[in-house]
Design a protein with these regions (language model features):
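Substrate/ligand-engaging "lid" and interaction regions
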Residues: 1-7, 11-260
Length: 260
């Protein structure tokens, strides 16, 4: 069975990356700073992804394991045994995650194996924000080997996760509620060699153009829905998005965006 490692076990890591990898037949290792999340995933041995608006697309995600960053040897083995790696820790935590991975590689040694890490954050220059501190923290020998054999690319996140009501969150703390969006474009230019086939992952030649488009469309539309929904008293993004009065505002927003 193919294997993947995800640095981060938050909502996007579980509810988007984890789901796509599971549906593509991968065994998944999660690495997270939160011991409660790691313990919960190991205890439940999986979780359920709820797709808003279409429960027929829901899926269980099983065949997983999780570690905190303290499990350095286990993480090292999982990284070099994996067919693909992802990072989804939150943009402000990229440097810390990079330092943790560098510490592990410095401890056990970089291997001359082709690997690709895809950074999945709503963050400017996400791949560079991870690669720069990682490279700096590696020893000279490990830096040369790691740099030669490891590609660090980035993806545009088009799916968001929402917070369920208090009762559901308490009853199913491991589960994730996400938008019904199934596309993960990745910067092909930063990939070394090739990556395995993964459901909904698309390697793009002109990644920069798509990233700019996404900033103006997906991010803006979510902001409009969230802000107007808040003003009208909604607490769930999907409920706000389905309201005719908000849809009309969104249509006018798209008209302005398309003029850019």
């Amino acid at each position: 069975m193919r294997k993947a490692i995800i640095f981060g076990a938050g909502k996007i890591a579980r509810g988007f990356l984890g789901q796509l990898l599971y549906l593509s037949g991968f065994k998944i290792t999660f690495v997270d700073i939160s011991e409660p999340i790691v313990n919960l995933l190991n205890e439940k041995k999986g979780y359920h992804v709820h797709v808003l608006g279409d429960s027929s697309l829901d899926s269980d995600v099983t065949n997983i394991q999780a570690y905190t960053f303290d499990a350095q040897k286990e993480i090292y083995d999982a990284f070099y045994q994996s067919n693909i790696s992802f990072v989804s820790v939150g943009g402000s935590h990229l440097s810390a995650a990079a330092q943790s991975l560098a510490d592990i590689i410095n401890l056990y040694g970089a291997q001359p194996l082709t690997k690709n890490i895809i950074v999945c954050e709503n963050w400017k220059d996400a791949a560079d924000s991870f690669q720069a501190p990682l490279t700096k923290a590696l020893s000279e020998k490990n830096r040369d080997i790691f740099g030669k054999y490891t590609g660090i690319s980035e993806a545009v996140l088009m799916r968001t996760a929402t917070q369920p009501d208090e009762e559901l969150a308490k009853k199913y703390p491991q589960d994730v509620w996400v938008q019904n969006f199934w596309y993960l474009p990745v910067n092909k230019a930063r990939i070394k060699g090739s990556i395995p086939d993964i459901k909904c992952v698309d390697l793009l030649e002109h990644f920069g153009n798509f990233l700019t488009q996404k900033m103006y469309t997906n991010n803006t539309s979510n902001a409009v829905i969230a802000y107007t929904g808040y003003l009208l008293g909604y607490k769930i993004l999907a409920e706000a998005a389905n309201r005719p009065e908000i849809s009309r505002i969104l249509d006018r927003t798209y008209e302005e965006i398309n003029q850019i």
